[in-house]
Amino acid sequence: MAHVRTYNPRVRVGNWKEDVTLEEETSKEFILQKDRGELTVQKEGALKQSILKPVSLSVSQDGFLHFGDTVMLVNCGDGGHMQRSPCVLSIIADSSNVTSHSQTNTGPHLLGPLQVGGAHSMDPCVRNTFIIISVDGSSDGEVVRYDQSFALKTTGGFAGELFLASDHKSFQKCAKKSRLQELSLVEEFDFLCWWKVLYFDPQDRLENEGYPVQVNNKVLISHCKTNQCLAALSNHILWSQFGKEYELTAHTFLDSHKAEQDNNHWLFSTAHPANQSQSLLQLQQEEHKENQEDTQVKDCS
């Protein structure tokens, strides 16, 4: 009996039946989730495909901003010592922010509240386009005037029609990096979603009050409740699945002359009348880049 082998690799020991059953159940659950598109990699892929879908911007024939226009909010950056690159107000979301209601047969869409950031991609898409909404009964097509209240809403469909909102900062609610006043996209529309456009030059601000807002020109976007202006912070970086982005807050940065700094200068970017697939700012930047290249070639020759 001393030479009899009582064990070989084919012998199952321990709770082998439970282990086999658990492995089979895990495999079945994985296949079921894959068929329903519920795997994390599938959700992230579907999110990027939906949120980066191109969107056509509005064309301003008269050069003014109108209620109902689809625009991008662009901070042109700073060419000085700060070297802040241009950025666009954009949605920050992941797969946990996507929901669908099978009971009402609606497709997947974003669920608020969501973060926003300053993305560097200038291509108009679901993520960075917003609709100008009236809050005082003005009809679509009417011009937006300086110091007139309005709201910013994401596009319909996947973007979920969320509203850009802000409120006074507190210990529990503030910007993640800078600890300044937080910006977010919310589902409920109230006074926290009201904004107004101010003329960027404080010396001429009173004279321009009530005049139509020009598109593709520098303006200030002020929050009606807190009187803080939309700002891009290049010294506070947010990392998302879309890359490195600037933190955006509602905070007014003043220089020694009590004038708002470049952090607070924004423009409503619309489409070029001749090429609606691109924004007017994109075409201007491409022309500027081509001119710089031509100048460098001439200097070298």
Swiss-Prot record:
Reported consequences of knocking out the gene: Morpholino knockdown of the protein causes strong ciliopathy phenotypes, including pronephric cysts, axis curvature, left-right asymmetry defects and hydrocephalus. Cilia length and number appear normal, but outer dynein arms are missing and cilia are paralyzed.
A biological process from GO: cilium assembly
Chief location bin: cytoplasm
Taxon lineage: Eukaryota, Metazoa, Chordata, Craniata, Vertebrata
Assigned GO CC terms: axonemal microtubule; motile cilium
Top-level taxon in the UniProt lineage: Eukaryota
Task of the protein: Microtubule inner protein (MIP) part of the dynein-decorated doublet microtubules (DMTs) in cilia axoneme, which is required for motile cilia beating.
Protein keywords: Cell projection, Cytoplasm, Cytoskeleton
InterPro entries, per database record: CF161
Protein name, UniProt field: Cilia- and flagella-associated protein 161
Source organism (scientific name): Danio rerio
Cellular compartments annotated: Cytoplasm, Cytoskeleton, Cilium axoneme
Pfam families (alphabetical): CFAP161 (PF24569)
